[in-house]
Curated annotation (Swiss-Prot):
Active site, UniProt feature: 130 (acyl-thioester intermediate)
Catalytic class of the enzyme: oxidoreductase
Higher taxonomy: Bacteria, Pseudomonadati, Pseudomonadota, Betaproteobacteria, Burkholderiales
Binding site for NAD(+): 15-18, 162-170, 272
Keyword Oxidoreductase carried by entry: yes
Pfam families xrefs: AcetDehyd-dimer
CDD domains assigned to the protein according to its UniProt record, in alphabetical order: ALDH_C
Protein name (Swiss-Prot/TrEMBL): Acetaldehyde dehydrogenase
UniProt record similarity statement: Belongs to the acetaldehyde dehydrogenase family.
Stored InterPro entries: Acetaldehyde_dehydrogenase (IPR003361), Acetylaldehyde_DH_C (IPR015426), NAD(P)-bd_dom_sf (IPR036291), Semialdehyde_DH_NAD-bd (IPR000534)
Record EC number: 1.2.1.10
Keywords: Aromatic hydrocarbons catabolism, NAD, Oxidoreductase
Reactions catalysed according to its record: acetaldehyde + NAD(+) + CoA = acetyl-CoA + NADH + H(+)
Gene3D superfamilies associated with the record: Dihydrodipicolinate Reductase, domain 2 (3.30.360.10), NAD(P)-binding Rossmann-like Domain (3.40.50.720)
Amino acid sequence: MKNKSSRTRVAILGSGSIGLDLMFKVKASEHFDLKFVVGRHANSDGLKLARSCNVETSSDGLDFLKENEDAYDLVFDATSAAAHKVNNGFFSGAGKFVIDLTPAKLGRLCVPCINLDDIGAEQNVNLITCGGQASLPLAYALKQAVDEIEYLEVVSAIASRSAGIATRENIDEYMTTTEYALAQFSGAKKTKAILNINPAEPGVRMQTTLYAHARYRDFDRVRACVAEMVEKVREYVPGYRLVVEPIESQGRITISLTVRGRGDYLPEYAGNLDIINCAALAVASHRHATARLGATQ
């Protein structure tokens, strides 16, 4: 175990499913010293669980982090898009590095397997959406393999029990941010994102299907680029795998994937939450390594 002084001090803002799963991931890492889990309701199950894990908690939200701004260096914001826009006003002024797990789209868009090395000294990194983290690696791989993408559609299906209040309240932002990121990372002329919430019991594992109308000359190159990208994602999301490898018909490419969660806190079927948390941890670990390298030079 590393000395606490060599670890990055972390606060988690948001005590729902994403925040709690992050708590277990952060506590398991030797790179981080988890200082706080902060929510809004003192008697919430999330804050009770955090306290039972010997983590300091508060139900005072952003006000608590303002009062204790010298106690942490990095914040995971797992609230909502609207709340993040308020929260980041303080964090940016205080010089805190924020990893935004909401679809607020304020900071640098990041998918670790694509542009982790490009985030540099950004104050705010946005992880887009769970569907974005699942589909964008494949969209980017297609960009490398085809001449042009005319239209790109992504359909994600998730279990109802893995869709919390914030997810349901942010549906519009989910669509807008995912579609924007798809255009940015793929170069597609038109994009569309669809999220289906499946009430089936037991919960069904997250599945995302990508449809692309594209011009290409070598479909073997499409397969190779997609396969290479899948392996890159699996470096930080081990449960990421294709269920339908690239197939083509009359200029339309179809690819489908599933994500099995690690089961740190969330059930394995909640791959939609696990993938964005794994991405968050990858970004945080990269920033930790960069900061430590800078301190030794």
